[in-house]
Amino acid sequence: MLIQEHQPASACHIGHYQRGQIEIDGHIYRQAVLLDGSGSVQTVNLASAAELQAADLARAAASQPEVILIGTGERQQFLHPRIAAAASGIGVECMPTAAAVRTYLLLQSEGRRVWAWLWP
């Protein structure tokens, strides 16, 4: 039986993550990035997930992903409940970036719509 991995056309390929950097589509990023499900990678000028605003999550929710992942770096941090509430019923999951990368890749391989903010 021939088995082939299905990679959605809009998918970003995360090659690896290590403290301080993330490799996405062959490029090394040393600052936070946003993967919005369109296949593009946007750098984010925020020092930590704590700087995310309700408007950021509302913008993500407007595109109706199934889940929003927040990779908070080496240690898990949580968003203020008021910020997370702006996602309008869409699941917001905060976790260390290594776990967020694994979760993103798994959900992406299933063809699920997912947004991710990742801090290296």
Q: What would you call each of these model-derived segments?
A:
Residues 89-109:
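C-terminal structural segments of small proteins and small subunits
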Residues 43-44, 76-80, 103:
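Short active-site-adjacent helix-start/loop capping segments
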Residues 1-55, 63, 109-120:
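Non-catalytic interface/targeting segments
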Residues 60-95:
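Mid-chain, well-packed structural core segment of small domains
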Residues 51-52, 74-75, 98:
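Short beta->alpha connector loops
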Residues 53-58, 102:
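A generic local structural motif
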